[in-house]
């Protein structure tokens, strides 16, 4: 499975790592993905991968199952 937030669709960012001499090498900034269980309106429980930022929002909306 891709390193992608299943709700927002966010994925890793790419860019350059810069040394002191400003040499550029490619690198990625990965998301802080967490597996959480969420409940829909019908009471069904699903396990999804979301970023830490999305997890904060879900907890605020009381969607996350403990």
From Swiss-Prot:
Keyword Transit peptide listed: no
Gene Ontology molecular function, alphabetical: structural constituent of ribosome
Compositionally biased spans, kind Polar residues: 11-22
Alphabetical UniProt keywords: Ribonucleoprotein, Ribosomal protein
Domain of life: Bacteria
Disulfide cross-links: none
Family to which this protein belongs: Belongs to the bacterial ribosomal protein bL28 family.
HAMAP family linked: Ribosomal_bL28
Matches recorded under NCBIfam families: L28
Protein name: Large ribosomal subunit protein bL28
Native organism taxonomy: Bacteria, Bacillati, Mycoplasmatota, Mollicutes, Entomoplasmatales
